Amino acid sequence: MKKILSLFILIFTTITSAGADSLSFPFTQDNVKDWRFFSDQVMGGISEGQVSLEQDGDKVFIRLYGDVRTENNGGFIQLRTSTSLSNKPSLFKRLHSSKKDGGKLQGIRLKVKGNGEKYHIFIQTTIFYRLPTGYQIATFNTSPEWETVEIPFNRFKNLKDNKDSKINAQDIKTFGIVAYGRDFKSDLAVSSVEFYY
């Protein structure tokens, strides 16, 4: 009986600790409405793409696919969520109201699979929102199998000058998953976004 009780306590402690050490945002039918597709066509580019919510067995994921083309100063398609005075998706509600210090969040984990291409995370914070220097970016690689990609915040660089970024997760204003920067076919699946301590 003591062994069973000890095992239960160990399992409970492990689950509680895991939950306390990260903020996880799986893609679902309910929260996918918080995300939007954008392409370089908003600035005269000719890249084309779309997003769809799909399922692979028990795994629900969002898929970003299309053709990235760099003509006309373009070169991106992206899946993005953002917060505003009139809209605050659950991702930002939990980040901004976290009882832990957002500055102690260490980075991002994504559960992804793709077509072997390199993709990007674009982040804007309240400090640099809507400024030309405002995007902080990091890259990750993909494979045809599901895998967890870990991107520490200290890997992010400023898009304009390539300097190191200092990101406090509680200051994040926009978060984008982006196919960017060269001519290629995008096909990326993401089942969850997680911020870890």
Residue ranges, per PLM feature:
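Hydrophobic h-region of N-terminal signal peptides that target proteins for export
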Residues: 10-18
